[in-house]
């Protein structure tokens, strides 16, 4: 290589390296600037959140909440905001799917008469553009007469604070289920098993899905029960007993009954499990402030894209680590999402 060629080649390499450094530097500066902006916004959000849950005056709490909503909406509109954790916001629920397809942010606020208002946002990936879209959730619980049969959206949301996000795969499709809590009012609480999916080529959320085996019209489960009741709705490995029947055979000295029961078998399955509810007073069907657990536990397990019900005796024999099976009871939820006395 002659001197001219060497000099030309060296200049070309230096120009390329300079271009990469400038490009990387500008990207890094943009990333750093974005991060610092998000940190500043998080500090403002944290201050507003503390006011939302510490002020004794209802109007001050809800005014802080409106400012919180506006500030959070601005923060979520920032580039790369999906990947910012908001760790300081420990009084609201933030659940992110393992596949990074979406995250859902929910919280509730109690007014002076003991009723709860629910708020939330969904950030979800538009697979067509690879961009994350943000949707504010509007609680329309009071306007949903057939709540277990309706598909809902961001503008017609059955408000809840979600504490568990369940993901299962079948036939190259991911199915998502949310478990949620609604403080409702001074008489009753609510829990919900809520499927969530997204419109094709969009990040727009769809709440409710026909994924419950042999329950085609059911879009979700909603449980309402007395504020005095301890209700369980969780997802974990559980043990259950089954008794099987076998056709018996005649013997020389014994005529068999049509069927004979085999001894109990104890099996285990990862499932959503919940208490069956019943009114404490006869004739109070539909008056949910009187509903308490009946003592029966029902399970749902995922198979071939559907949630199937286990009707056998589910045993309280969960040996899993508590860290892997955290499901807050109502008292724990009250500590996470504070209520006013």
Language model segments and positions:
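Short aromatic loop motif centered on NTY/YTY
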Residues: 148-157, 161-170, 184, 205-302
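Beta-propeller blade signature
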Residues: 118-127, 192-200, 292-304
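Beta-propeller fold detector
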Residues: 132-140, 205-215, 309-315
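Short beta-strand elements that form the blades of beta-propeller/WD-repeat-like
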Residues: 101-108, 174-182, 270-276
């Amino acid at each position: 290589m002659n001197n001219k060629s060497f000099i030309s080649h060296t200049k070309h390499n230096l120009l390329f390296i300079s271009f990469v450094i400038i490009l990387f530097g500008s990207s890094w500066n943009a990333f750093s600037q974005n991060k610092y902006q998000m940190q500043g916004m998080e500090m403002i959000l944290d201050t507003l959140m503390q006011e939302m849950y510490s002020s004794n005056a209802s109007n001050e709490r809800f005014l802080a909440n409106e400012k919180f909503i506006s500030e959070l909406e601005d923060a979520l509109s920032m580039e790369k905001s999906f990947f910012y954790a908001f760790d300081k916001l420990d009084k609201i629920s933030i659940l992110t799917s393992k596949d990074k397809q979406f995250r859902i942010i929910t919280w509730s606020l109690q007014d002076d008469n003991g009723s709860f208002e629910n708020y939330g946002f969904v950030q979800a990936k538009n697979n067509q553009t690879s961009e994350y879209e943000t949707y504010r959730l509007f609680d329309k619980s009071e306007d949903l007469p057939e709540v277990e049969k309706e598909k809902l959206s961001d503008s017609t949301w059955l408000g809840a604070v979600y504490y568990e996000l369940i993901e299962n795969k079948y036939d190259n499709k991911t199915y998502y289920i949310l478990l949620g809590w609604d403080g409702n009012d001074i008489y009753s609480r609510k829990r919900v098993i809520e499927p969530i999916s997204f419109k094709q080529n969009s990040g727009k959320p769809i709440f409710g899905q026909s994924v419950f085996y042999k329950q085609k019209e059911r879009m979700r489960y909603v449980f309402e029960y007395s504020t005095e009741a301890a209700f369980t709705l969780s997802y974990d490995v559980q043990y259950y007993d089954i008794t099987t029947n076998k056709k018996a055979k005649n013997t020389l000295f014994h005529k068999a009954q049509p069927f004979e029961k085999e001894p109990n078998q104890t099996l285990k399955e990862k499932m959503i499990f919940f208490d069956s509810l019943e009114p404490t007073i006869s004739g109070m069907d539909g008056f949910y402030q009187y509903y308490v657990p009946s003592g029966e536990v029902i399970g749902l397990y995922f198979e071939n894209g559907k949630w199937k019900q286990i009707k056998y005796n589910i045993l309280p024999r969960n040996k899993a680590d508590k860290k892997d099976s955290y499901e807050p009871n109502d008292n724990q939820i009250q500590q996470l999402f504070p209520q006013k006395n």
